[in-house]
Structures are given as structure tokens and as C-alpha cells.
């Protein structure tokens, strides 16, 4: 490569994040920013990085899609037997991060994770396209397989078995992260970025500005 990675840089300055304009409730602030990311037609504004830590204390990350949020927390769906599922079972502390590059914004969320109810998982599973529902059966997520043919053979087998109405596998469902910390980052000029952190203390959200 002729171009040095160290020379890659970008100036920020599209917007600002001030305490006077920011919501006192971080969920409302998140709702506003996510809505703006969707309105801006960003590619997959619902994509978020999920960080978990296993019993070996090694962290791992992956991209998942937010499928719902309210005062109870942030929801996504996945395979419970996957690496992330096993890590969450052993250590429910996790972190999420949204990065909306075009808006020069990042949102970080930390908290404890638990499974959503079977009713919530069933309702979302039944709303998915048929191929996705078959795929939940066909993929032994995070396991070593001999080749892609294994997945295709599994998909054909389960497709023939369940036809148009595959039930939700017991190893597949939703998780909800209940936030106890939020951080909103807005890129600013001269690397003097805006960072507002919300932390739960005494049952209330405390908002603080952090140095960038």
C-alpha cells in the first residue's frame, strides 16, 4: 500500500451536542438520534455492535440488529447456542454501540442482558420471512462445519419438514439489555468532540459531560 493508514483522517463538525438541547432521559435522546439516522436513509441504521465477555475473560464483538426498544431496554434476536449466547449465559454484562458515520455520531450502551419472554420471541419469529425462519433451524451457529453444503442440506431438509410453518426453535430467541449507562458522542472540530454520559444513580439518570 502506498497510502499510510496513519495519514487517514477526517475533520468533524456537522452538528453539536449541548446539555441544554439534550433530553434528560437517555431513551428519548436515543429515540431522537435513531429517528434522524433512519430519516437520513443511512445504510442499516439499526445495526449495532454487541460486546460480550466469556468465562475466559476474552471479549468478543459482532454486529446484530436492534429489533425493538422501550423503557425496559434494547432488544435483538439470535441463536442462544451461539458464542454470544453462551457468553451471555455465563456473564450477563454486555455493551452495545451504534456508529452512524454520516452523522458523525456514536451511541454506547452498557447493562445487564436477559432473555425476552417466549411470547415475544414467538411473535417476532413468526413475522420473519420463511427463508429466515428455516435458516434459524439450518444453521448450528458458531459451530465448525465441513462446508456451505451442510447449511444448504439442512435448509432443504427443514424446509421439507416444516413446509410453510416452521416453529421457533428452542435455541433461538430474543435478548434484552437493560441499560444502566448511556453515552452519546458527537464529532466536533479539532477533535474536541461532545460526549454526554447518562448513568443510573439512586433510580435516576445523572447526565455528565466527559472530556473527549
UniProtKB/Swiss-Prot annotation:
It catalyses: pyridoxamine 5'-phosphate + O2 + H2O = pyridoxal 5'-phosphate + H2O2 + NH4(+); pyridoxine 5'-phosphate + O2 = pyridoxal 5'-phosphate + H2O2. GO terms for molecular function: FMN binding; pyridoxamine phosphate oxidase activity. GO terms for biological process: pyridoxine biosynthetic process. It is an enzyme of class 1 (oxidoreductase). Gene3D superfamilies: Electron Transport, Fmn-binding Protein, Chain A. Substrate binds at residues 9-12, 67, 124, 128, 132, 191-193. Its EC number is 1.4.3.5. It holds the Pfam family PNPOx_N. Pathway: Cofactor metabolism; pyridoxal 5'-phosphate salvage; pyridoxal 5'-phosphate from pyridoxamine 5'-phosphate: step 1/1; Cofactor metabolism; pyridoxal 5'-phosphate salvage; pyridoxal 5'-phosphate from pyridoxine 5'-phosphate: step 1/1. Its cofactor is FMN. It comes from the Bacteria. The keyword Cell cycle does not apply. Keywords: Flavoprotein, FMN, Oxidoreductase, Pyridoxine biosynthesis. FMN binds at residues 62-67, 77-78, 83-84, 141-142, 185, 195. Binds 1 FMN per subunit. Belongs to the pyridoxamine 5'-phosphate oxidase family. Catalyzes the oxidation of either pyridoxine 5'-phosphate (PNP) or pyridoxamine 5'-phosphate (PMP) into pyridoxal 5'-phosphate (PLP). NCBIfam families: pdxH (TIGR00558), PRK05679.1 (NF004231). Homodimer. This is Pyridoxine/pyridoxamine 5'-phosphate oxidase. It comes from Verminephrobacter eiseniae (strain EF01-2). The gene is pdxH.
